[in-house]
Swiss-Prot record:
GO cellular component annotations of the record: cytoplasm
Compartments reported by the entry: Cytoplasm
UniProt-recorded name of the protein: Cytidylate kinase 2
Enzyme class: transferase
E.C. designation(s): 2.7.4.25
GO molecular function: ATP binding; CMP kinase activity; dCMP kinase activity
Length: 178
């Protein structure tokens, strides 16, 4: 079984994907810019500003997405990334998590700290930068996800356990097996 899960920052992609992987005994694949920043011993905000937004060649985007594309070919996996539903062509189930920006900003603030107004502004800016980069690099509009997914879940008013249950029900309904 292969599952691809996408959504913008603060939607619970990582949390829910890891729950799915653990429940079904699947490999959890979630390699992000945060991981690259940690590997380089650079704070994420600095890495994002200098290496993602500050470069014109999209090197790190292509590095990350190539690695995820290779990993997405493995069986018995849950791939969680912004572009998972586009990258994982052979996924048995493609899921997109959606939440209002204000809710995502609150969740990010709870996870990472900071002032709400700053987190809201940086969340908006990151969304806009991601959209521009993915359009430029891959001609992918990350706001046009409905035709690429099997299941869209609005997570604005539900917690990760409820999201997991909805996904588990869909997996069972489709009779997907590990």
């Amino acid at each position: 079984m292969k599952i691809a899960l996408s959504g913008k920052s603060g939607c619970g992609n990582t949390t829910v994907s890891s729950m799915i992987a653990k429940h079904y005994g699947l490999e959890f694949i979630n390699y992000t810019f945060h991981d690259i920043a940690r590997e380089r011993n650079i704070p994420f905000s600095e890495f994002y500003e200098k290496e993602i937004i500050g470069r014109d060649d999209y090197y790190w985007d292509m590095y990350l997405d190539k690695r995820l594309s290779l990993l997405s070919k493995k069986n018995n996996t849950v791939l969680a990334s912004r572009l998972a539903i586009w990258i994982s062509k052979s996924a048995d189930l493609k899921i997109y998590l959606y939440a209002k920006m204000e809710v995502r900003a609150e969740r990010i603030m709870t996870r990472e700290g900071g002032m709400y107004s700053d987190v809201l502004s940086s969340t908006f800016n990151r969304d806009e930068n991601d959209k521009k980069r993915y359009l430029s690099i891959y001609n992918i509009d990350i706001d046009d996800y409905s035709s690429k997914t099997d299941l869209v879940i609005d997570v604005t008013n539900i917690n990760s356990n409820e999201v997991f249950e909805l996904i588990r029900d869909e997996i069972d309904k489709r009779n997907l097996k590990n």
